[in-house]
């Protein structure tokens, strides 16, 4: 687990997550609506830091980004959790799952994932997709910074329900 950004203390052992407009007030030992940001003794932690539920190389058009490096591939990665509960979600198995076994799952470092993306010659970078990437914010930002430093492109397929961005390619999966 990694300490989450965008939080404030409400009272002892109770904090507010300010990442998305839900602004969840989370008591000690509990999680927010996304199920992946948990309060432990007054601090909110990202339970899924480094945990990848799905990965693969996809045509960029599958994101769907049709005018962003057309004909190229991008390394798509996702984790668990979402800050919405859409009835039509095509990836509900990972976006709405609440695994209690995160600690037993394989963890990846940002370096490992960026290296995997770099191995394929026709790959332009990394896309954060499958579940809602905003709930994985700290890990996503660590990967994106490293990928950008190596000349890779980054993309985010999101529901757009986050306090920090003014624009995005919004899709409801």
Predicted features and spans:
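Short Cys/His-rich Zn2+-coordinating modules
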Residues: 1-8, 16, 67-70
């Amino acid at each position: 687990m990694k300490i989450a950004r965008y939080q404030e203390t409400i009272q002892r052992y109770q904090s507010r997550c300010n990442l998305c407009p839900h602004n969840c007030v989370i008591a000690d030992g509990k999680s927010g609506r996304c199920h992946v940001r948990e309060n432990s003794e007054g601090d909110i932690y990202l339970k899924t830091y480094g945990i990848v539920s799905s990965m693969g190389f996809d045509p960029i058009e599958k994101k769907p980004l049709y005018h962003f490096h057309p004909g190229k591939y991008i390394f798509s990665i996702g984790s668990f959790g979402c800050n919405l509960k859409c009835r039509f979600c095509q990836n509900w198995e990972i976006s709405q799952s609440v695994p209690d076994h995160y600690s037993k799952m394989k963890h990846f470092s940002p370096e490992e994932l960026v290296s995997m993306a770099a191995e394929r010659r026709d790959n332009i970078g990394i896309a954060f997709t499958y579940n809602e990437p905003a709930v994985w914010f700290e890990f996503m930002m660590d990967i994106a910074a490293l990928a950008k430093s190596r000349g890779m492109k980054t993309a985010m397929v999101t529901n757009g329900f986050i306090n920090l961005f003014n624009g995005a390619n919004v899709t409801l999966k």
